[in-house]
Amino acid sequence: MENQEKASIAGHMFDVVVIGGGISGLSAAKLLTEYGVSVLVLEARDRVGGRTYTIRNEHVDYVDVGGAYVGPTQNRILRLSKELGIETYKVNVSERLVQYVKGKTYPFRGAFPPVWNPIAYLDYNNLWRTIDNMGKEIPADAPWEAQHADEWDKMTMKELIDKICWTKTARRFAYLFVNINVTSEPHEVSALWFLWYVKQCGGTTRIFSVTNGGQERKFVGGSGQVSERIMDLLGDQVKLNHPVTHVDQSSNNIIIETLNHEHYECKYVINAIPPTLTAKIHFRPELPAERNQLIQRLPMGAIIKCMMYYKEAFWKKKDYCGCMIIEDEDAPISITLDDTKPDGSLPAIMGFILARKADRLAKLHKEIRKKKICELYAKVLGSQEALHPVHYEEKNWCEEQYSGGCYTAYFPPGIMTQYGRVIRQPVGRIFFAGTETATKWSGYMEGAVEAGERAAREVLNGLGKVTEKDIWVQEPESKDVPAVEITHTFWERNLPSVSGLLKIIGFSTSVTALGFVLYKYKLLPRS
């Protein structure tokens, strides 16, 4: 009662309070405002954007040190950014990509490095085909209801990879595939969750590709503009440096308290922060047991994003585009992309330090990390020019207390089937957004927009402004960034796995041997 009086006296009464000023929370606030709903966004940091963050200085002009990439089928973020007047440009892959393995550099073109060993090729082909086929069995909006959910959720992705792959070559690349896509280790994540994650991003080729894939484009001026421009539209409806500490929905209206002891009153709350950060908030009444258990069990991925700037794009002299896939345990960086500005200025290579390596290298001084990265690039690209950068930027997301890591939260084994179904379930008048709650491109900016707008429509339904059937809305395809259907050749669809080939050989050998015996003992007619 005392809190209610404080909130009312201060005049802080709103229809909805959104906790979290990232893309998801701000997408929700924008949609609610368009329906005439009074909204307040409370953001803990001194900036908006959440896990997107555009740094601006004289050395880089602008650089995305957080989420940056968009591509075909990510239609919501493309629609929103266009509405906000933000243009995209294509990440450069005009020249050759590079695979670095066992100390050697192998240039290639396409989404995946080529495999010349026929046995390894069968293994690779079967790996991607199996991951995609298993994903087809998993409902994007309810992975816990998949036919084999219990079996796959008890298994780590490492166990599944080891079960599928016969060759070290395929197994090693599969481990890297997990590192790159979810910034965690294969032994840490549930096979069910990872299979779902890849499926809801369009499959193995779509999630990993630059061209026609999740990394095709970036925003001119940086992805931070998405949140910044929504904040400009909302004006004083966004409050920075306001970490929420208490949410009390025990009375008619909900009372929100922030770290600086300000109080706000509202009818509904949208919680748009990573699930694990919800544990920083005191709820009254307490959260339901399943929700409380869930938020304690979803760790964040680990990543340090590194941008190395050079006087010129020296890699292009060798017909390299700047994309490197690096399979080397001692290498700090696992994958890179060209991060040069679309007009060709400020040549740069963006590299990810991922998962176990992020933890290991975070213990080193920044200058030592920089030196190790330059030495790696010099070795992989075969150029001493890599040793002489003009500037270096990095962002260790593991040290961000209001993110906890990046790109996204992951599900360890057993959690999806036991607690996953509550990820989007409202708690009283509290609704949940954030990219982790999305059903398409979860973990990306696209997922953040889907989740924010869905949570906003849930509130609008509660306010009587939209019907229940209008909560989930199909998004039309972007006309500016159309998707090309990903197809597979007859051989990709039908070539046997290594184990299948061995069975065929074994069967053929057995038939041949049987025929020889029958022939020898005159049990077969002679022509």
Swiss-Prot record:
The keyword Magnesium does not apply. Belongs to the flavin monoamine oxidase family. The chain crosses the membrane at residues 498-518. The record marks 374 as: Important for catalytic activity. It catalyses: a secondary aliphatic amine + O2 + H2O = a primary amine + an aldehyde + H2O2; a primary methyl amine + O2 + H2O = an aldehyde + H2O2 + NH4(+); (R)-adrenaline + O2 + H2O = (R)-3,4-dihydroxymandelaldehyde + methylamine + H2O2; dopamine + O2 + H2O = 3,4-dihydroxyphenylacetaldehyde + H2O2 + NH4(+). The gene is MAOA. This is Amine oxidase [flavin-containing] A. Its main location: mitochondrion. It is an enzyme of class 1 (oxidoreductase).
